[in-house]
């Protein structure tokens, strides 16, 4: 996806991906994470239930949220246990090794017995924002991959905006391999990109 920042009047407006997840090992291998000066968010989410905000968090990673998460009315005790079980089962998830039948994310969550309430208040708004869709119909395997990484990593932002990420990655790429303002119109032989200016 697109990653960048617009700098205007001392404000930073990030475009494309809004946070950096520290668990994505491939991205970490492409840049020096220390160079982009990450600032971290606490694990969890602040959710509005129609009346007021409540916090749902991972007490295993943020002990300060233990009681607020345990006694939150956003989800039943059963849902909380199912989330912890899902986190445990997907802790070392590999999408390449997943031999289970694929289905939509919403079907997967329903098959695991999550209540409609926790799906509507947590899973749908959180993952719809990631998948860019309303009803989380995205592949359950991709959901498991994303859930696993969010369970292990932390959401973070570079101190001077998301633009620091492509800037850092580009330092390790030869200048003649970077094409700016060029539209891709096709892929040839699975490894050659064709641009609209007829260059390959």
Regions found by a protein language model. Give the residues of each.
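Glycine-rich FAD cofactor-binding loop and adjacent beta-loop-alpha segment at the N-terminus
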Residues: 2-44
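A general beta-strand register signal
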Residues: 7, 48, 179, 194-195
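Soluble or luminal CAZymes and related metallo-dependent hydrolases
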Residues: 19-23, 100-101, 161
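Mobile amphipathic helical/loop "lid" adjacent to a hydrophobic cofactor/ligand pocket
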Residues: 27-28, 32, 37-136, 151-152
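Helical element adjacent to the flavin cofactor pocket in flavoenzyme catalytic cores
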Residues: 142-191
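Core beta-strand elements of the Rossmann-like FAD/NAD(P) dinucleotide-binding domain
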Residues: 196-200
């Amino acid at each position: 996806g697109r990653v960048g920042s617009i700098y205007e009047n001392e404000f930073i407006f990030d475009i494309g991906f809004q946070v950096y997840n520290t668990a994505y090992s491939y991205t970490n291998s492409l840049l020096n994470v220390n160079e982009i000066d990450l600032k971290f968010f606490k694990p969890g989410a602040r959710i509005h239930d129609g009346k007021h905000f409540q916090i749902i968090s991972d007490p295993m990673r943020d002990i300060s949220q233990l009681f607020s998460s345990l006694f939150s009315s956003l989800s039943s005790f059963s849902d909380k246990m199912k989330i912890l079980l899902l986190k445990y089962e997907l802790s070392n998830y590999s999408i390449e090794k997943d031999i289970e039948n694929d289905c939509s994310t919403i079907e997967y969550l329903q098959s695991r017995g999550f209540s409609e309430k926790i799906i509507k208040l947590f899973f749908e708004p959180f993952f719809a924002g990631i998948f860019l869709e309303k009803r989380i119909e995205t592949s359950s395997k991709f959901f498991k991959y994303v859930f696993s990484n969010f369970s292990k990593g932390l959401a973070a932002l570079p101190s001077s905006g998301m633009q620091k990420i492509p800037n850092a990655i580009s330092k390790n790429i030869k200048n003649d391999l970077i094409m700016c303002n060029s539209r891709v119109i096709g892929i040839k032989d699975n490894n050659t990109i064709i641009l609209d200016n007829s260059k390959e």
